């Protein structure tokens, strides 16, 4: 007997209008927000970095890859090229904590040169200045600050240049507040200047970017002078005697290290010049008392050798006779 087939009809259930929708739109919206955030981040970075820093960032991105192990961990913030130090909050001023990498360098960790090994005194010869420069270079290499410190031995003394790079800014943009890295660097250099009794010149330098009108009367002259004085105060706070400083100068943009690119970060710097004794005497002659200087002696000798006019001799004789008569009358 043939089996009968049964047809089953299933009534579709009508969906209500208040049934919740799926979450696919949330994923799309999240992607949109991430893209928008990335856009604003790129615009912000382009605003805060200069031309040289942009070149360095582009070169780094072109030369590195997340798949290349030779470039290390891409999430390592210690090697970040970001203008903001992701390893620490750069908005918080330094409290001079000795745990900082720069300050702890001279706390007896056992690596690098010993500042206490320097014999206190005046460094005048080229050999002495070269040895002092070597100590500073080894210290900066130990703390990975080679790109921020340049030491040069000159006939007049030792020139130490502290400058910006694309990783570290010395001061807040347009201000005279030291960033924590350079503040600790100056505090670490202070014990060295305590041992070296040579006079010190501190000069501040800016780039050629002028201040906008909204800043009123502020200028690169005032800014460079303020930054140089902040460097002096930091060194004194670190232990350097205040009488070591012979001159604090603001140079504005009149001595550019990179004149081809006046707006370059190389031009924003602080220079510490350790003067030899002869160079310090020359500076004293220019700005100090010149009564006993060679120039004054030569001037007096020239005046003494000038020919005397007859009328001046007669007037001098008459004045002398009057003075003698007054004395006799007394």
Swiss-Prot record:
It is a single-pass type II membrane protein. Residues 1-26 are cytoplasmic. It is found in: Cell inner membrane. SUPFAM superfamilies: OmpA-like (SSF103088). Induction: Under conditions in which the polar flagellum is not functional. Probable integral membrane protein required for the rotation of the flagellar motor. Might be a linker that fastens the torque-generating machinery to the cell wall. This is Chemotaxis protein LafU. The gene is lafU.
């Amino acid at each position: 007997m043939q089996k009968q087939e049964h047809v089953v009809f299933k009534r579709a259930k009508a969906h209500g209008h208040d049934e919740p929708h799926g979450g696919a739109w949330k994923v799309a919206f999240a992607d949109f927000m991430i893209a928008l955030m990335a856009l604003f981040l790129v615009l912000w970075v382009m605003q805060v970095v200069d031309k040289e820093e942009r070149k360095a960032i582009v070169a780094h991105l072109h030369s590195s890859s997340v798949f290349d192990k030779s470039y290390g961990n891409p999430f390592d913030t210690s090697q970040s090229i970001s203008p903001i130090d992701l390893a620490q909050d750069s908005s918080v001023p330094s409290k001079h904590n000795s745990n900082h990498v720069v300050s702890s360098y001279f706390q007896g960790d056992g690596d690098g040169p010993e500042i206490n090994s320097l014999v206190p005194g005046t460094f005048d010869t080229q050999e002495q200045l070269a040895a002092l420069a070597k100590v500073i270079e080894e210290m900066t290499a130990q703390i990975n600050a080679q790109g921020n410190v340049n030491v040069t031995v000159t006939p007049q003394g030792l020139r130490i240049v502290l400058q910006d790079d694309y990783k570290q800014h010395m001061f807040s943009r347009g201000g005279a507040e030291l960033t924590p890295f350079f503040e600790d660097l100056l505090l670490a250099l202070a014990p060295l200047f305590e041992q070296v009794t040579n006079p010190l010149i501190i000069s501040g330098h800016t780039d050629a970017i002028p201040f906008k009108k909204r800043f009123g009367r502020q200028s690169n002259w005032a800014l460079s002078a303020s930054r140089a004085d902040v460097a002096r105060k930091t060194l004194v706070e670190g232990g350097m005697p205040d009488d070591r400083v012979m001159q604090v100068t603001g140079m504005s943009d009149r001595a550019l290290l990179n004149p081809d690119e006046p707006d370059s970060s190389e031009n924003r710097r602080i220079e510490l010049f350790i003067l030899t004794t002869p160079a310090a005497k020359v500076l004293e002659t220019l700005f100090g008392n010149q009564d006993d200087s060679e120039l004054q002696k030569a001037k007096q000798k020239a005046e003494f050798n000038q020919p005397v006019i007859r009328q001046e001799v007669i007037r001098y004789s008459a004045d002398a006779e009057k003075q003698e008569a007054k004395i006799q009358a007394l």
